[in-house]
Amino acid sequence: MIIGIDFDGTINNMLETWIDWLNVRHGTTVKIEDVVEWELTKVFPTLSKKDLFAPLSDPDYWSAVTFKLDAVEVIKKLFDEGHEIYIVTSSSYKTLVPKFENCLFAYLPFLKKENVIITYNKSLINCDILFDDAEHNLINFKGIKVIFDALYNKNS
């Protein structure tokens, strides 16, 4: 089986780390429960977009991002069973090096760069199944769609 797995928010705790990172650096008090939609500018209204997105280019931030419970073990098991595993991300090119070096390949060293697909249009991906936390990434995908539950996608 060819399996596509979104990276941010699906298998890692990016959002939790991002909120903590911003709270410490900017004196804000946002909690994960406050994030009930995609637009983070609404929960951090006092921050500029530059300040809001700055952590995503910081290697130290990506070193602090952890993976969700059992994610590494499940992905490794699927890989060992012979499934083709692809990490499918719509990340900005500016964040790719720190994200991959300090997080993705640190947790999933059995994957190679050939197992990573970068695209803003996940409907182009030719996988049998796609796991994602964003409904808009699954809408036109032609295979089996699995949406990961999150506070920000409850109204999707």
Residue ranges and their predicted role:
Residues 131-156:
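Acidic, Mg2+-coordinating phosphoryl-transfer loop and its flanking beta/alpha structural elements
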Residues 43-58, 82-85:
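Short, basic/glycine-rich phosphate-binding loops at helix/coil junctions
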Residues 88-140:
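Substrate-recognition "cap/lid" segment bordering the active-site pocket of phosphatases
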Residues 62-66, 71-101, 119:
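Substrate-recognition element of Asp-dependent hydrolases with the DxDx(T/V) motif
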Residues 38, 121-127, 153-155:
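A short acidic, often aromatic-flanked loop/helix-cap motif at beta-alpha or helix-coil junctions
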Residues 1-51:
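Active-site neighborhood of HAD-like aspartate-dependent phosphohydrolases
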Residues 84-86, 129, 146:
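A structural signal for isolated positions on well-ordered beta-strands in alpha/beta enzyme cores
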